Amino acid sequence: MAFFTVALSLYYLLSRVSTQAPVVQNHSCNTADGGYQCFPNVSHVWGQYSPYFSIEQESAISEDVPHGCEVTFVQVLSRHGARYPTESKSKAYSGLIEAIQKNATSFWGQYAFLESYNYTLGADDLTIFGENQMVDSGAKFYRRYKNLARKNTPFIRASGSDRVVASAEKFINGFRKAQLHDHGSKRATPVVNVIIPEIDGFNNTLDHSTCVSFENDERADEIEANFTAIMGPPIRKRLENDLPGIKLTNENVIYLMDMCSFDTMARTAHGTELSPFCAIFTEKEWLQYDYLQSLSKYYGYGAGSPLGPAQGIGFTNELIARLTQSPVQDNTSTNHTLDSNPATFPLDRKLYADFSHDNSMISIFFAMGLYNGTQPLSMDSVESIQEMDGYAASWTVPFGARAYFELMQCEKKEPLVRVLVNDRVVPLHGCAVDKFGRCTLDDWVEGLNFARSGGNWKTCFTL
């Protein structure tokens, strides 16, 4: 942490001396295996707007397959790649920048770029950077599980959003590219086998929408607004002093911080140029921002929401079905028509890949109890990732996030389950976990009582 503090402080000192956006000369800091390691002192604290970066080094347990074991099954659950802002946010960002340009009477130092900044970001779709992320993800998946991928074609599903489907397709491109370089592979090119519509009334385990009480709950919005009201005023005052003539809200402050990530991800195909928006803010402010995003996800979709984990029950029960090769037992968000048909939900595959959104993935992780060690997050002060027991939006659901659910066969007869989130081994809960973070399959499934019992899903439809 001391190195982080010194490095980040140095970065901000230098960024305030120069008005030029930092640039790396090549994209060796952005690789398929390590993810986005460019400008890590800032890019790794953007919450869910961080691009995927491997956190293998943060794991107390090696991600390598233990000696004497082999992986016999893998399910990857992935978020889509980096995207442009949503349509509503894109309009808000553009309007804010126009207002600053209209009202500010001077632009100096790190703010000079704002005077002539032209907002050209699109809305909702993947950026080229995001497309490349998913190509890298597919290639990494093939190489990591080559022994299985050589002989098995993954069964692939995607939630129906354009950016999610496009992410699945780019993942396939990367998988196929690695496959073609492996002369030992004889399998056909994968395809997106199932696209689950994101429409009202259509059950979809990869996108929440059907739990009425959950969708109408505004508690997380209130918690986010309260924390923004704590961190926002000092930043707002400083920006208003530095840019005379402007008036900002606390929400405006967060929007300007959002632009750091979105502008960076849109500038180049590999993220080699850091947006000048980033240098407007300090180390402390970025840590507050990162925590704000984690807070929002925890109380919006995780254990901090009464019905957050319930949104992940359906997928959890689908994973149980795949691991045990038995019919899906679920009465929550699963689509019975799809899940009862071997053509749309086979149970005999060795490789599965599903593509989703950050919010749904948070719910799934908490439905599985992966972060049961995380205590309720403070609503008024920043906690470290260590204090949150490894939970953070940037560590769990960055753009291009991926969780690997592995089944291993070792010397003993009974298979073992292991879970990695962005390359970090997450020790399992609710079962007898070994030194490698694993539990036997039967023990882990038995420990998933919340999901197997349907949790509190029935309260979704109570007034």
Curated annotation (Swiss-Prot):
Cellular compartment(s): Secreted
InterPro entries: Acid_Pase_AS, His_Pase_clade-2, His_PPase_superfam, Histidine_acid_Pase_euk
pH dependence: Optimum pH is 6.5.
Cystine pairings recorded for this chain: C29-C38, C69-C410, C211-C460, C260-C278, C431-C439
Signal peptide: 1-19
Keyword Transmembrane annotated: no
Post-translational modification: Seems to be cleaved into at least two pieces, most likely due to proteases in the supernatant. The N-terminal fragment, called phyB seems to retain phytase activity.
Keywords: Disulfide bond, Glycoprotein, Hydrolase, Secreted, Signal
SUPFAM superfamilies found in the cross-reference section: Phosphoglycerate mutase-like
Name of the protein described by the UniProt record: Phytase A
